[in-house]
From Swiss-Prot:
Gene: Mib2
Organism annotation: Rattus norvegicus
InterPro entries: Ankyrin_rpt (IPR002110), Ankyrin_rpt-contain_sf (IPR036770), MIB1/2_ZZ (IPR042056), Mib_Herc2 (IPR010606), Mib_Herc2_sf (IPR037252), SH3_15 (IPR040847), Znf_RING (IPR001841), Znf_RING/FYVE/PHD (IPR013083)
Reaction(s) the record says it catalyses: S-ubiquitinyl-[E2 ubiquitin-conjugating enzyme]-L-cysteine + [acceptor protein]-L-lysine = [E2 ubiquitin-conjugating enzyme]-L-cysteine + N(6)-ubiquitinyl-[acceptor protein]-L-lysine
Entries under SUPFAM superfamilies matching the protein: Ankyrin repeat, Mib/herc2 domain-like, RING/U-box
Record-given protein name: E3 ubiquitin-protein ligase MIB2
Post-translational modifications: Ubiquitinated. Possibly via autoubiquitination.
PANTHER family: E3 UBIQUITIN-PROTEIN LIGASE MIB2, E3 UBIQUITIN-PROTEIN LIGASE MIB2-RELATED
Amino acid sequence: MDLDPHAGVQVGMRVVRGMDWKWGQQDGGEGGVGTVVELGRHGSPSTPDRTVVVQWDQGTRTNYRAGYQGAHDLLLYDNAQIGIRHPNIICDCCKKHGLRGMRWKCRVCFDYDLCTQCYMHNKHDLTHAFERYETSHSRPVTLSPRQGLPRIPLRGIFQGAKVVRGPDWEWGSQDGGEGKTGRVVDIRGWDVETGRSVASVTWADGTTNVYRVGHKGKVDLKCVGEAAGGFYYKEHLPKLGKPAELQRRVSADGQPFQRGDKVKCLLDTDVLRDMQEGHGGWNPRMAEFIGQMGTVHRITDRGDVRVQFNHETRWTFHPGALTKHNSFWVGDVVRVIDDLDTVKRLQAGHGEWTDDMAPALGRVGKVVKVFGDGNLRVAVGGQRWTFSPACLVACRPEEDANLGVAERARENKSAASVPVAGSLSVALDKLRTQKSDPEHPGRLVVEAALGNVARALDLLRRHPEQAGFHPAVDTKNQGRTALQVAAYLGQVELVRLLLQARASVDLLDEEGNTALHYTAMGNQPEATRLLLSAGCGVDAQNGTRSTALHVAVQRGFLEVVKILCEHGCDVNLPDAHADTPLHSAISAGAGASSIVEVLTEVPGIDVTATNSQGFTLLHHASLKGHVLAVRKILARARQLVDAKKEDGFTALHLAALNNHREVAQVLIREGRCDVNVRNRKLQSPLHLAVQQAHLGLVPLLVDAGCNVNTEDEEGDTALHVALQRHQLLPLVADRAGGDPGPLQLLSRLQASGLPGSTELTVGAAVACFLALEGADVSYANHRGRSPLDLATEGRVLKALQGCAQRFRERQAGGGGGVPPGPRHVLSTPNTVTNLHVSGTAGPEAAECLVCSELALLVLFSPCQHRTVCEECARRMKKCIRCQVIISKKLRPDGSEVVNAIQVPGPPRQLVEELQSRYRQMEERITCPICIDSHIRLVFQCGHGACAPCGAALNACPICRQPIRDRIQIFV
């Protein structure tokens, strides 16, 4: 039985009392609603594993059993607060699209669904049985008809409730001050992230704001006047802590469609006609397209799918009527699943499995070929493997932008060069075999292709000058002039002859190339000098906006590059992709290092140039692993070392993501970059190195001072990431393909005295290393899960705890290591405890770890450690055992120890003034158009906008002045 991971207990869920309830009126009575704010964890005496802490709307905060001792005290009422959504499902009563929370599907009627609110309000026939879906992936649970079942009224923070500030309040005096009341005017979702997770409150002074009631597990409000929130059927709600099973088969039509997907309708006409009601309607002509392949054009606001079958025919379909033909196509960015046993099983008969494929598990790659049997050729980690599509999951396109897949660079380069070279070669062959009139002016191009200088001169003499111009000299044959052909072939004498005959040096071929482009294509330095001496345009751009310098750089022709630079070409001109020649040189790899040196020595080069993907030259060099380019750019502009792309990635992020260890060393040692910089997802370079299992980079970043306890937007530290990913990927040092990372990591683990290191998986090895360096094994993420909770295998759990203990011993002995940064856990000091782990006795006199006196030790909250006496505890701010910030200090009798010095907080007026300044600063750097991104472009008038908005403007949106120039800034 596979459990649905999305249906597990998570902070933010809204709950009511369940069948095993024995805690009196702690919830305010039957029907009271609360929010899960903390999950139990291994080793905690008050909130052990399989328990939860609930913040009830009326104010009580207590822990309850969610499978502990086999009991379930709570029922799940709503899980929309944790982001559960059924994307293509519409409630057939309230017509809300993208049903949030649990889905209730009628077993009698065809395709009839209700949301939780409509189901509990007795919508639809009460004699019909329904199925309950906890998530879009879970297997349905069959329920009895609602008729005759008791309904319990809900009470708590709902529309109309009277509220005051609650336990997680952090909004200053927005409510008018402590004790002021407000009225809930609406319950809504937080943008598109979560549903029914925040409350809009109007306070007594008339101000209205939105506050968390379950969003991210936080509760900003306390109910002092309950409001009715509808009803619920107790028998139909799932037990909290008993997750639903995964569907055995997730069909393609159950997945959300995306533009470009290839789909078919495989239903009978009668079934399709019934399904189309309310989903685009039915047209008899639609029957003609049943079984035909179509392409998803767009998804409508209602979730229906608009499918294009040819240039003129489009139909709107119910999403359930369509089947994806193939989820992956050439160029798609995919991630290989990291479950070793599953991949081995799925590969049988689909490319098979070899142990050399192990490094690809969990990595991101690109589809380079789709075979007829549906199997895929995927480029990943510098290798190409054949995978079953079942082994792959789709990734967002932006992940590809930051991944320097070697195959992509080679494909892009060849795609840019082969068609031109190929078509030119074909044209030359045709010219050399052409049977044409010897007197025809186009014959001059043929003689140029054959290299016949004498016959070319004879042709020019037969066509005398007219007004100082030879009419034959610029005649085209196969789309090219004689000068262009001679320039490509390096026929210096012929080029000189044609120039003397006043051939046009800047005449364009069908692709916009001049003769100078042709000398660059053919690697002809002398012909290049001749054309430049004749006054040709050194910066002429072809149809792809490439200059001759771009062409020479892309083909690696060093001498031509030198000549063009000597003649003052513009090294900063961008092509159609906004790539400068230096971008192209970096893409060419180590083979173009000499060209990189030449370009970076040009006095006027702009090393801050950014291409269409938002990569500066330093970003691009870090992406491609070009060490020389990184050094040269840093020597000119070290201030770029921490510059961020739109997604927040810096050069170090890109080096860490793509396993460019030497680049990372240069950025850290020579560039002195910030090793703890974070992107828009709040990921540090260490997060990315661990995510991609780059074992050589992890120690480098840690040794450079990277904070091992930094959390991302999900609250995950690098230790969480290590245990969530690569858990089943074996750590094999001798198959690392020359990568010393696994061997170095193993040697450091073995040096610490960790036994059995050679049998560790990649995830476990990285996790143990991080724990040895001070990563907090008890750090709870936003879902309340600590690394100890994720270490499901007993051997790994024991090793992790041992490494953490070794770090603490090393710290106590004055050894090295990175101390864990200060943090706050999800526990709250006013939590009442219902449960105690059996076997824990009351405190007795023990030796204080600080003064060594025998005394009753103080209990620290939330970590629950007793380490010091009352006198020593007064001045402590962090527990000396686990480094967790202390929120409360309790004597054995339960009374609270007062701190030695109570530092007064800042005056309210000062706080408000600082808040006002912050808002003003934020407004000054925020784009005035989308009011979302930061300003990245400044216009000549002094106003600005973000890059996407600014690129589309012709006039300043503030002062209406025409925009003549855009200056990119780095904030």
